[in-house]
C-alpha cells in the first residue's frame, strides 16, 4: 500500500492511495482524494473486498503520516493484520508497489488530463479494470490477476 501525488488541470494537487495484492497482483484500491488521512485509509480498507472474504496477514507500508495513524493501527489490530513498515528512505523494501506505481504513473497519470477529482477517479477505475482483467503477467503464468484468482479458486475447490 502506498500513496502517489498528481495534479488536476488547474494545478490543484491530489493523492492516490494504491493497494495491490502481492500474490495475485490484483489492484484492490486506487482511491483519489485531495487530502487522505489515516482515518480515511482505515475507512477505505473497511470497504475493500479481499479475495476469499479473508483479510491479509500483513500489509506492507512506508512510514508516511497516513500510515502511522491510530485509526489505521486500530483497524489492523482488530483484524489481526500486521502493518509491516519499510525502512525510512528504502523504497526497495516495498519494490512491488513501487513498480506498480511506476506503471500507473506512466500509463494513466502522465497520459491523462484530469478536469476534476471525479474525472481522475473515473480514469483510475478504468485503468484498474484494464490492469486486473486484460493485462497478463509473466509472474502469473501469463494470466491476468482476475484469471489467476479464478484459477486459484477452482484449484482449491477441486482439492476438497
Language-model features, listed with the residues they occupy:
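An active-site-proximal beta-strand-loop segment
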Residues: 1-28, 34
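Short catalytic-loop micro-motif centered on adjacent basic/acidic residues
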Residues: 31, 58-62
Amino acid at each position: 500500500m502506498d500513496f502517489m501525488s498528481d495534479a488536476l488541470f488547474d494545478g490543484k494537487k491530489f493523492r492516490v492511495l494504491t493497494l495491490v495484492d502481492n500474490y495475485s497482483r490484483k489492484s484492490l484500491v486506487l482511491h483519489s482524494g485531495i487530502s487522505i488521512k489515516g482515518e480515511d485509509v482505515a475507512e477505505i480498507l473497511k470497504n475493500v473486498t479481499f479475495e476469499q472474504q479473508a483479510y491479509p496477514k500483513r500489509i506492507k507500508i512506508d512510514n508516511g503520516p497516513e500510515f502511522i495513524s491510530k485509526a489505521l493501527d486500530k483497524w489492523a489490530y482488530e483484524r489481526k493484520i500486521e502493518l509491516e513498515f519499510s525502512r525510512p528512505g528504502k523504497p526497495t523494501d516495498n519494490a512491488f508497489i513501487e513498480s506498480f506505481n511506476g506503471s500507473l504513473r506512466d500509463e494513466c497519470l502522465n497520459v491523462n488530463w484530469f478536469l476534476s477529482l471525479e474525472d481522475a477517479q473515473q480514469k483510475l477505475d478504468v485503468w484498474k479494470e484494464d490492469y486486473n482483467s486484460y493485462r497478463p503477467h509473466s509472474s502469473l503464468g501469463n494470466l491476468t490477476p482476475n484469471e489467476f484468482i479464478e484459477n486459484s479458486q477452482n484449484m482449491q475447490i477441486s482439492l476438497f
